[in-house]
Amino acid sequence: MAPQMTQFIESKRPYQEVGHALRQMIINMDFAVGDKLPPEREIADMLSVSRTVVREALIMLELENLIEVRKGSGIYIVALPHQRENVATEPCALNAAGPFELLQARQLLESNIAEFAATQATPLDIANMRSALQRERDELKTGEDETGDREFHLAIAEATHNSMLVELLRQSWAWRENNPMWLKLHTRIADKEYRKEWMTDHQVILAAMIKKDPAAAKEAMWQHLENVKQCLLELSDVDDPNFDGYLFNSYPVDLVRN
């Protein structure tokens, strides 16, 4: 099976390569909705990659609503790639959007999601946020990719208990992960200090969630994404004809309070 799967891998980021291989495996091996994929370790062995890369690929497919990872049970197919229209990883107009346009959309969406989540979060939701934050800490120590970052933002959306808001969040992250300019910028974020600062932002957001303070949660999320934007501005090539940093400026955080 390994040679058949490996031939589908193209020149992308490792987790995207594995995700593409898994999509093709689902199509070519006639899997059906409800079928179970091989376990994480077996996939890693088949593709000769680390389990961390496989885990990131599975998160990507979860964001696309193709699979569901059930703790203690396995990886299940919930939709077939060829059955779904407008899959986020397929070429679309949104992939032509610049990273700052995406960030502006995320600020508007996620700050309001955080505000609402602070009023709805259960003890289990808070536990999920804590777990994602701990994963971020672990990844920072080992230098792994930012799986915990995605999990933290998704845990906040899930705390709203509104499936549409969760889906909007999933789609925005899928667009982010497949946006060419975002990926280009992301490769320049080698300094761990940025990630430490963003993790500190997440701690502030979590504190607001625990206190059930919607205004503080909204402000903290807005400021977090503003900090991400400022980091990307520092790393951007302003002479790039596709640079959109000054076209999608955000409101100062003090205006968000009003």
Which positions does each model-derived feature cover?
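Short linear motifs at protein or domain termini
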Residues: 1-115, 119, 253-258
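Short, 15-30-residue, compositionally biased linear elements
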Residues: 14-15, 193-199
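Short helix-coil transition/hinge motifs at the ends and kinks of transmembrane helices
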Residues: 90-92, 185-193, 242
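Conserved amphipathic alpha-helical segments that form helical-bundle/coiled-coil interaction surfaces
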Residues: 105-183, 199-202, 207, 216-230, ...
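Well-ordered alpha/beta subsegment
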Residues: 210-211
